[in-house]
Structures are given as structure tokens and as C-alpha cells.
Design a protein with these regions (language model features):
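Histidine-dependent nucleotide/RNA phosphoesterase domain, centered on the 2H-phosphoesterase fold
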Residues: 1-188
């Protein structure tokens, strides 16, 4: 089973992000951008990859430990950007301007408990909107169009919501893209 742990987002935030995505697609139409389906928008706390089903109870136990002492809290989704940078954009994302510290706290606890060798990379809470296929034709032109299109959303607010749970998700890869299924939720 291909698994990850996520903070899911409400429909209002999803709809605001989808409206921005539609504007971006018109401004930077390019087959080199692989857009994430709006129903798959989420904030990844930890990607676990392929896991044996027998490990599910330990994963849920780690989720419960990671959220211990964390009450429901506000998450604000604001601005667009790219990873790793505008010279080599691979991922187009919407950022988290509020709630990132608590998301990071839970992500770090999950990583310490569930990964044999924690990555040591800093946690950057975000919602992936698109991935850039590499290599792509006219990469410089695409970067310019994408930069120009996202600049107007640099500080845009896509909504705030109260995060009340974290979810264990299964990702099934299909020719039409990933299909996500919620396996378990742990309340904050």
C-alpha cells in the first residue's frame, strides 16, 4: 500500500485554489505542467511510500502520539510559489501562512517515529497544485509564463479553516493520475 499522512482541506479552500488554477492554466497553458486534481489537494505531513498492511496499527498509533497535546488550530492558505526555486521549478504550490508551526511539529514527530532515517530536510507546509514534467520543450519560456501568471497570486488568500484531524491516506496510481482514499483519521 502506498501511504501518506495528511492534513485535508475543506471545500471552500479547495474551490478557491481551483479558481486560481483555472486562471493559471489560461495564462500558462502548457503540457509540461501536470496539474493535481482538485479533489487531491492536501497538506502532506509525511510520505510513507509502500507499506505492508500489517504496519497500519503502528502508523495509527504514531499519528495519535504526534497529535497529543495539539488542539484544533487555524490553517491559512496564502500565496503561490515553486520548489525548489524559479531557476529550476519542479512543483507549483499554495503556501501556508498560519498554522505551519503546529503542522511542522506533527510532521517532525511522525518522521521521528515512522521513518528509519529521518530526512533532516526542513518541513515546508504547502498544497501541491502542479508538477513540471522534465525535460520540457521551451523550459525558459514556460518558467517566464508561469512566473508571470503566479505573480498576481503571490499574496492571495485562499481561505482559513480550523484543522480538526489528520488523515492516513492511500495513494493508488492510475493512468489518469493518483486516486486517494482515506483509511483513518485521528482527531486533534
Amino acid at each position: 500500500m502506498r501511504l501518506f499522512i495528511a492534513a485535508l482541506i475543506p471545500d471552500a479552500v479547495r474551490d478557491a485554489l481551483h479558481q486560481a488554477r483555472e486562471q493559471l492554466q489560461r495564462a500558462a497553458p502548457d503540457r509540461a505542467l501536470r496539474w493535481v486534481a482538485p479533489e487531491n489537494y492536501h497538506i502532506t505531513l509525511l510520505f510513507l511510500g509502500e507499506q505492508d498492511e500489517a504496519r497500519l496499527p503502528a502508523i495509527v498509533q504514531a499519528m495519535e502520539a504526534a497529535r497529543a497535546g495539539v488542539p484544533p488550530f487555524t490553517v491559512a492558505v496564502q500565496g503561490l510559489g515553486v520548489f525548489p526555486n524559479w531557476n529550476r521549478p519542479n512543483v507549483l504550490w499554495a503556501g501556508v501562512s498560519e498554522g505551519g508551526r503546529l503542522l511542522g511539529q506533527m510532521a517532525a514527530a511522525l518522521e521521528r517515529t515512522l521513518l528509519p532515517a529521518p530526512s533532516g530536510k526542513p518541513f515546508h507546509p504547502h498544497i501541491t497544485l502542479a508538477r513540471l514534467k522534465t525535460p520540457c520543450r521551451d523550459a525558459d519560456g514556460l518558467k517566464k509564463r508561469l512566473y508571470d501568471a503566479t505573480e498576481r497570486f503571490a499574496l492571495a488568500s485562499f481561505g482559513r479553516y480550523e484543522l480538526r484531524s489528520i488523515s492516513l491516506m492511500q495513494s493508488t496510481l492510475t493512468p489518469d493520475g493518483s486516486v486517494y482514499t482515506k483509511l483513518h483519521a485521528v482527531a486533534l
